[in-house]
Amino acid sequence: MIENENHSLRDRVSDLEKKVHEQNDEIMCLRSTLADVLRRLSTVEGASRVSNSHSIGRATPTKEAGIRLRHQNNDIRDSSKRASSYVPGRSTSTSHISRRGAHYQSTSSLYSDGHSSSSVSPAPSPSPTHAQAHTPTVHHHHHHAPSPTAHHHHARHTTLASPARSGPVGALNKRWASTSDFATPSRVGHAHSPTPTNSQLARRPNSGSLHNLTTLRSATSQLNLGRHGAREAQYNPDEGVVKLYLRGRPLNLYVPTALQETYSPTASTAHPPAKLKLEWVYGYRGRDCRNNVYQLPTGEIVYFVAAVVVLYNVEDQMQRHYLGHTDDIKSLAVHPNKLLIATGQTAGHDRRDARPHIRVWDSVSLNTLHIIGISDIERSVACLAFSKADGGSLLVAVDEAPDHNMSVWDWSRGERGYKMLETKCSADQVLAVDFSPVDRSTIITCGKNHISFWSYESGMLAKRMGIFENRERPKYVTSISFTDAGNVISGDSNGNLLIWQRGGNTVSKMVRGAHDGPVFSIYVQKDGAIITGGKDGRIVEWDRELERTGNIIEVPEQYGSPRVVTSGRGSQLVVGTTRNCVLEGTFTFPMRPVMQGHTEELWALTPHPGHHQFLTAGYDRICYLWDTMAHTIVWSKDIGEHAQSAAFSSNGEIVIIGTTSGRWFVMDAETREMYSQHQDGNEPIQVLKFSPNGQYLSVGSRDNNIYVYQVSEDCRKYTRIGRCQGHASFVTHLDWSADSQFLQSNSGDYELLYWNAGLCRQIVQTSQMRDVEWASNSCTLTFATLGIWPEGADGTDVNTCAKANNSGLLATGDDFGKVKLFSSPACHQKARCLEYGGHSSHVTSVGFLHDDSRLITTGGRDTAVMQWVVSPTSPSASQR
């Protein structure tokens, strides 16, 4: 009876939560409608004031109009009611609605033949079918896209104001009928055939199938892509200027003279003449995850980083990738048959579109078999395990939410599985969960202040806490495993190992000081030998009785401590470490890294100007030079400071590293010798750019200034020419002109300024710069990048962009983990693009290799570096 009442209570609470979410959406609609009315009233008044002297296309809100509006607060509600009484027109979305959707891929979409990536070729964004407008040919030499700091991009803003459009008062005849207007794909052109939203699907546990998830993902993807374009852009053909509004702030973008007569912001654009395919992922998530490295019968090591599961064949030097997840993967479990894999993810940026869930998939075909827990998991899947005694018919998962709920699933029943049991696991953090290999009904969990022994019978879970008796109780039980007899072995934060007798909850044996610090991993081999890994950097072998065999591996400090230890090929061990490395080795032969990665937030990226190499640097103080052909690290160097930006000299012999302290280093790109260091202010060096002729270096700082240096002595000597002052906020991006005379720069308050580099003076007559040819296009706010901005963008969504050297492509990275590929220049609204997932954090930098054969992207907090092959498409495909 109590259980039924609790179940009914949970259902009622769930219904109330749904209503609250819906009401929040309605409130957002009302706020947006109100802002829309204010903006449109301002536009109408501005248009009437200048109608006798200017065309209506140039009408913008005036300061006086804004002042008058502030005195009309009493009329706001009436205006809002009038606006909402009309027939619904095209809805205006807010920035949070255009965030990434829940990309639940179908089983077929994840198929990968051979060793190729499972990266899915995305559907191109819809666009009108008009002829493509003529665009000029642009030559460029640099492709590094400096990025702003994390603080700027972590602050999220919701754009409530709709665009200021000129036109009759009838333009006000628009409203939102309900919250569904925000999420349905009707704006794409199917107003009379709405499709369920991801959030609606997630709220209906029994609605639909994998096919429905696929259809939904496709519709949502097309919707998001169709929204591309600066919705508030207005074109004045008389002056040849496009006015773009970001968070209500106008930005004038001047159209090149050759395009003024034929340019239209809404003209149709071609698909990019190439597509991307994920080739290689550098990195591994071991710093804060456990039990996430395994050897498969295919000879591949499986692990994850960001939103990608990597299947890496070390011997053949090939990677495959499972790309079904939409945000950070936090847990991984391998089925007893060694072919099926379950992975769990965290909640995404938009909780409705990227809800935490578990995916069960085939490691051979990369087909998704089941999607579990979409409406049941609150925060993220902290740990996972398949049952062993019954051949893996059950799956247990622990939620990372405050209650740390544990749920047991019959995962193969239906496409969404069947939840058999759920209970609160612990008030404290849970670090691991596992089934007994001999007792189907026994589950063990461990974590902060506890080890718990669970048994389930007749639909009930019974819990017994581990009893330490007179032994020291550890603060954390950090790892668990089972002997072949079913006894539990646990490791704790005190460095002790304990054996718990099968069926009991008391300690039968204890080994003190097995490690100097926490025991992170316990692995029992087929012959009964036990291998442990600890924070002390040691891997120790024990016999069945927990007596040392004398075999010890000391993992070098540079690789970190062993986070997980498992069996590899033959007698080899595979080790995942706390410094995001994957190692292979034996007790006889030393450990060697098969994968290394950054350990902290990553911002600096610069491709080599002449080789298939690129350099990355991050807040972990480490610089890596990577080889894209061998997929290896050429060299690494600890610079001793948090790195923010980097740039290769034109000849590739020198690399400049900018730090968060305002210091930047001059380093030999081959020997790693430090030639000199310089200090420009005390704020982070956001951007570093060499001029095309190699004679100047521009340094963009968070102190709002751009410092210009004369370069001499083969790029080893730097003499400051001056400082460009004029930005009201920190510098985010820089570009040199092709003739090395001018600079263009963006700032944190959405400015686009131009500079005479030799004089360090601002060029106030910006219209004079409309025909300047730019060597690169890393500035995100320019005429050539007008089309990269989604509707409702708040100016911080797009972090980075880079123009290809010779292939007419433009790549961008945004706050939602998406990499997008456009045709260059992307100077029209609703510019068509191809969108790719994989990163789970904001994409901080993108850059093409010197021959445009590959695109390199870096994630911020996900610390991942991804390498994409750029493959040309047929002309007919790019024109469709």
Show which residues each predicted segment covers:
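Intrinsically disordered, low-complexity acidic/Ser/Pro-rich regulatory regions in eukaryotic proteins
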Residues: M1-H7, R40-Y245
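Non-transmembrane coiled-coil alpha-helices
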Residues: I2, N6-L9, V13-L16, V20-Q23, ...
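Intrinsically disordered, low-complexity segments enriched in polar/charged small residues
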Residues: E17, N24, M28, D36, ...
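WD40-repeat beta-propeller superdomains and closely related acidic/aromatic-rich repeat-like regions
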Residues: A202-R880
